[in-house]
Regions:
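Gram-negative bacterial Sec-dependent N-terminal signal peptides
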Residues: 11-13
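Short solvent-exposed beta->alpha transition segments
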Residues: 24-25, 31-35, 39-42, 49-96
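Intrinsically disordered, low-complexity polar segments enriched in Ser/Thr/Pro and acidic
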Residues: 29-30, 141
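Repeat-mediated protein-protein interaction surfaces in helical alpha-solenoids
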Residues: 20-22
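A short, structure-level motif marking secondary-structure boundaries and short turns
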Residues: 24-26, 101-102
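N-terminal signal peptide c-region/cleavage motif recognized by signal peptidases
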Residues: 15-17
């Protein structure tokens, strides 16, 4: 893992314990963000392509074009997101104006990973604008 990525991950994991307050966001925003991520993961578990696609931001929807292409990409590229064994929500943070929800996922291979979900407000709803996976510092279970 490149040194910069390690340093960024270490800073994120050690900065503030629990769910950090992000300027301009309420506790209900945090709950809504976690709800969107959780409902999208449940849609993936059911292979509900249209349902999962609905939680993606307009930019992601435009990039993939169809729910089926989106689901296929997640299935191939993000197996821990597509079929997690466990999901644990971490810190909600703000990075250069971006809202990022940290989620600890354990995939079917039992290897923990940290998913960094970039969130975007669309009207009065939250949508997922991107997801980056990094290795967790935890040992697989």
């Amino acid at each position: 893992m490149p040194m910069l990525r390690r340093l960024l991950l270490a800073a994120m994991l050690t900065s503030a314990a629990g769910r950090a307050r992000v300027e301009g966001l309420s506790a209900s925003d945090g709950a809504a963000i976690r709800g969107v991520i959780g409902r999208q993961i449940e849609a993936f578990r059911r292979d509900d392509a249209p349902g999962a696609f609905d939680f993606a931001s307009p930019g992601i929807q435009k990039m993939f074009g169809t729910p089926e292409r989106f689901l296929d990409m997640v299935r191939r590229t993000y197996p821990a997101v597509y079929r997690p064994r466990s999901v644990e929500y971490g810190e909600l943070s703000q990075d250069n104006g971006r809202i990022v929800q940290q989620v600890e996922l354990t995939g079917q291979d039992r290897q923990p990973q940290v998913a960094l979900y970039e969130m975007e407000r669309v009207g009065d709803a939250w949508r997922i604008a991107g997801c980056t996976l990094v290795r967790s510092l935890r040992v697989g279970t």
